[in-house]
């Protein structure tokens, strides 16, 4: 059995994401951890596959993403890459692997050698030097601001960010700083819709939202969440796309359509 894709679909590249943003075409992104789903998601039209440290939750059973190692992410990145998807492959830098610019570069090199085409790291203003260091060394970067799950203990839980005047001002500073440092994509998690919209219109680079409103340049969900595979209470920003669909591919295609036509997220999935 082979998972190699034979597709005439043009490859999604970092410049392509910018072109999509500039043309007003929404970007559909999902997490992915293995070759089988890499092939299926690519067939279904997903633009970006994220090997997220969310694997610590949905695959390893941890309550936070903190235990996930760089080796874990590299292993799953290699699995996803073996299917040779046309979608862009983005990989998370786990907690504790980018404390200095040099450490971030070494970690990024390992993930890019495994097949990643872009790395994602969590943080705002304080990461500007690191982002600049990576971009100068040909490492494409997605900066993750707002609710950053690796900071769960500092936040005191998984809480919406930017609800206060001071918090909103900090989010705007973070977004400006990471773009100025060279981040090619900014991911916004769990922020009020108005803030997501303001950041999206303020920046030139694409924004990807998860609980950040419909105005973002694109959307991302954890694969297991959008397929209805989650224990306990469903996060507000999640929609179960398996409902009413005959199979997983149909559910993923429904997600892609909903992102592309702007019907997801709705107000019920936003803050």
UniProtKB/Swiss-Prot annotation:
Binds 1 Mg(2+) ion per subunit. Transmembrane segments: none annotated. Gene3D superfamilies: Phosphoenolpyruvate-binding domains (3.20.20.60). Pathway: Cofactor biosynthesis; (R)-pantothenate biosynthesis; (R)-pantoate from 3-methyl-2-oxobutanoate: step 1/2. Mg(2+) binds at residues 53, 92, 122. GO terms for cellular component: cytoplasm. It holds the Pfam family Pantoate_transf. It is found in: Cytoplasm. Its cofactor is Mg(2+). The keyword Magnesium applies. The keyword Magnesium applies. Disulfide bonds: none annotated. InterPro entries: Pantoate_hydroxy_MeTrfase, Pyrv/PenolPyrv_kinase-like_dom, Pyrv_kinase-like_dom_sf. Belongs to the PanB family. This is 3-methyl-2-oxobutanoate hydroxymethyltransferase 2. It comes from Burkholderia lata (strain ATCC 17760 / DSM 23089 / LMG 22485 / NCIMB 9086 / R18194 / 383). The gene is panB2.
